[in-house]
Each structure stands twice: as structure tokens, then as C-alpha cells.
């Protein structure tokens, strides 16, 4: 591989903020459309100890000759007290602890204090417990507040009786020192009063913005680092650097959002606010790089393909792992994680990332595929076989050879590039060697599952139409079955009624026949009896005196 001048390498490292990668073959991967968009360091963090910051909300003015009456300061004091009164009352309600010496009743007092929270999450209850604990150390806090009340220094470290270091921050005093103190003896009191009033009004606006959510319940809503930045003003970097005792970039830590603050108590007498800042413990993994990869489509025999690589990998000790960083905090130059999320990658992908391009796996792309270009480090990477690449300055059309996977366009080739309807201003020079001995014609194209959006949509539409037809047929047959079932039920009922009718009629006929037979027998007997009575000699003659013929 072509070696770069040491000065160029130094400038490149300073520009990106990271060291060049060895395990991953970045130059070779450019041939197949894999671009390293960002390289970050890997940081681990865990919950650390808490630091306390005392914010002095009222500035100290230098002594005057007695002729100046700064009315704006009194108005600011009244307005600030009105603003903080809901916070003070809420904190007092939550931190109320029963005055007793027994352990059981002390615990019950904390429970009573927490009962003011209502329905709260575990994190909110933890925050409230922190306020209760801070209230138990109220004497030390008051001593700390008193010790910084008379100072004009914007940042001063004070050690209380328990040797707990806290930082006294006077954000507004920092502004007063810069704008007021140096000229208060040489200008009129009215002008300074107006200037002080404008500064105080601006700070009140910022305070209202910061504590907008905390007015309802400050213990349950932590202050973000953005709110702390507004609250502490220009003193925040000094506070953070004094607390962390680390070489990490302060802006990087602030952008992570891992530093949070919580209001612990407010002193109405001194207008001072005690804020607990939760500072995690950070550890950097030496030699580890988290690399973001962008895979754009490449050209293979006039067919559009895309290589199968992870979106983010971890390079450590000359090894490569998949590193999604789903549970991590990603900043411009670092990845903050609680644990290592690395996982093994297939051997073919490993060899591909190491520069063995014949081991790379490609998937054909059919239809529209939006990832045809990428803009990284001031250089444009594009598949100009599937995309119209036009240079506006100097005007020409960028052509791409059939054996090349992508085109790399830097400021030497074009300063303003047009990709279809997109316009890009190219600002950097491509300072790596573009390997041209690999031909996409010999690439290992594996037809995994082609990403054919148009065909897939058509297939889905056909499936939906077929499903609708089947549903219509199903409804028709269901209606038919429902009608047939009704007819069958009616026929069965009619048949049963007919059978019952026939049985009843048969029984009636049998009964009538039996009744008629009995009537005939009765009539025959009655006629015989009547004849005997009328002709007794006949029966006596024929039956020898037995009128019934009985011997």
C-alpha cells in the first residue's frame, strides 16, 4: 500500500480526532462501497459519587460611597424569592423528617416525608431520599453557605467539617465582575443600576426556563446538563474539570448527557441553591475503536449490488466484532457504554473486512435503492453507474469504468457535484490509496434474498387481492351454508310435525275403531236380551229351560 507523508498522517489524525485503523482494510473496502464514516473511542461508565455545588443567586456589589441606591437589586431579590418559593415549599414538604431519636420513628418520619410524593417511580423515590439525607446534614450545608456568602470569587472550593468538598459557584457574580465592578466608580449610579437590572432580568429569564418543570416537584425532575450550563454560566467547565479529575474533553462529557443535577435544598436567607451533580465514573478501553460503516451500492457487470457488512464494528487487539451500541450513549468522538456489546461476526465478513475482498458477500439490488452515495470527511463516494454524476465546477459528467465498484470524487476532481437533484460542495482531498487491482467482475456475488422493492410490493398487492377474493368466496359459501341450514331446519320441523300429526291421527283412528267395535258388541247384547224377554217360550223350547242355552 502506498505510504503517506508523516505530516499528512499527523494532519489527518488531528482532523478526525482518532488514530488510523489497522485491522480493518479501509482502502480496499472502498472498492466495494464500504466507507468508514466515523471512528470513536470506547468508554465504559458506571454510577459514581455525587458532588455538590452551591449556586449563589444574588451577587455581591462592591461598597459604594453611599450615594448610589441600586433599586434593581431589591426588585430582583423580590422576584427571585417569588420564583423560588414553590421550590422551597416543595423541598421542605418532601424532606420533612420526624424529630425523634428512635430508629423506628426516624424511618417512619422518612416514610411520612416520602408520602408527599404520591405515586412515584423508583428513580423519583431515590431522588427524594437524597433530599432527605441532605436535610440531615443541614448544619454543614448552612456553614458552607455562610462561608461563601461574602466572597466575590466566581469559583471557590470550600471544605466543610466532614471534609466533603463542594464548589461554590456564583454564576451571576461572574457577569457582575466582568461588566460592573471595574467601572462602578467612574460612571453614574443610574447607568449602573440600569445595567445591573438588565443583567438580572436576563438571568431571571434563564432561571425561569431552567426551573419550569421543577416548579411542580423539583425532587422528581433532575436538571439536565443543558440546564446546569445555563444556571452556572461560564463557570461550568471549571466545576466539571475540578470534579472529574480526568483528561477527558469537557465538551465531550457534557454532550453525552450522563452528567445530571438535582436540587437538594434552597436557602431563602442567602438565596443560595444546593445542587447535587451525579458524576459517573469513566474508564477508557485503550486501543479500542468503534467504527461506523456505510455500505453503498456498487457496480457489478452493470448490476447493482450491496455488500453485507455490519453497520458498526469494534476493532480491538487486531480483532473485529459486531458492535451495535444499542444501549450506549454515542457522542461525536466517543461511545459510552455500561458493558461491552461486542459479538462475533461470520468468518467471511471477518476476512472481507480484513481486505480479502473475494470473501465478501454481495446481494443483488433490484428496483430503487437509496444508498447509492455517501459523503464523508469532505469526499463524495458514489455509484455513478446507477446514478447520474455531474460536476458543476468544472462542468463535466463523471464516468465510472465497468470494472470499478464505486467512484471517489474529491476536490481535485470536482469542487461542486450534482447527483440527480442533490448538490454537494466537496472540500477535501482523498489522501488514501484507491486499490484498482480488484475487479468487481470477479466479485463473489451470492444471491441471498434480493431486495426487490417493486416486485415485493407487486407480490404483496397480488397476495392481498387473492386474499380478498378468497374472503369474498368464503362469505358467499357462508351465506349459502347459512341459507341451506335454515331450509334444512324448516324441513326437519315440518317432517317432525307431519310424523306427529300422522301418529295422532292413527291413534285417533284406532281409538274410533275400537270404540265402534265396543258399541256394536253392546248393541248386539242389548238386542239379544230384549228378544229373550219378548219370546221366553222360544228359549225354553230350544234350551230345555235354560234361556241362555246353558245345560
UniProtKB/Swiss-Prot annotation:
Task: List membrane-spanning regions.
Answer: 493-513
Q: Which family does it belong to?
A: Belongs to the paramyxoviruses fusion glycoprotein family.
* Cross-referenced InterPro entries: Fusion_F0_Paramyxovir
Kindly report every residue range on the membrane side named Extracellular.
24-492
Its subunit composition reads: Homotrimer of disulfide-linked F1-F2.
**Species lineage:** Viruses, Riboviria, Orthornavirae, Negarnaviricota, Haploviricotina
- Those parts of the protein on the Cytoplasmic side are 514-551
Q: A GO term (biological process) for this protein?
A: symbiont entry into host cell
How does this protein sit in the membrane?
Single-pass type I membrane protein; Single-pass membrane protein
Q: Know the name of this protein?
A: Fusion glycoprotein F0
Cysteine pairs forming cystine bridges in this chain are 68-189, 328-337, 352-360, 384-389, 391-414
PTM (free text): The inactive precursor F0 is glycosylated and proteolytically cleaved into F1 and F2 to be functionally active. The cleavage is mediated by cellular proteases during the transport and maturation of the polypeptide.
The task this protein performs is described as:
Class I viral fusion protein. Under the current model, the protein has at least 3 conformational states: pre-fusion native state, pre-hairpin intermediate state, and post-fusion hairpin state. During viral and plasma cell membrane fusion, the heptad repeat (HR) regions assume a trimer-of-hairpins structure, positioning the fusion peptide in close proximity to the C-terminal region of the ectodomain. The formation of this structure appears to drive apposition and subsequent fusion of viral and plasma cell membranes.
Looking at the UniProt record, the site noted as Cleavage sits at 106-107
Protein's UniProt keywords contain Glycosyltransferase: no
Predominant subcellular localization, coarse grouping: virion
- Name the GO cellular-component terms: host cell plasma membrane; membrane; viral envelope; virion membrane
SUPFAM superfamilies, from UniProt? Head and neck region of the ectodomain of NDV fusion glycoprotein, Virus ectodomain
- Coiled coil, from the record: 132-160, 456-481
Q: Which UniProt keywords apply?
A: Cleavage on pair of basic residues, Coiled coil, Disulfide bond, Fusion of virus membrane with host cell membrane, Fusion of virus membrane with host membrane, Glycoprotein, Host cell membrane, Host membrane, Membrane, Signal, Transmembrane, Transmembrane helix, Viral envelope protein, Viral penetration into host cytoplasm, Virion, Virus entry into host cell
Glycosylation site positions: 65, 69, 77, 90, 431, 461
UniProt subcellular location:
Virion membrane; Host cell membrane
The record lists the organism as: Human parainfluenza 2 virus (strain Toshiba) (HPIV-2)
Q: Tell me which Pfam families the record gives.
A: Fusion_gly
Stretches the record annotates as Fusion peptide = 107-131
Q: Where is the signal peptide?
A: 1-23
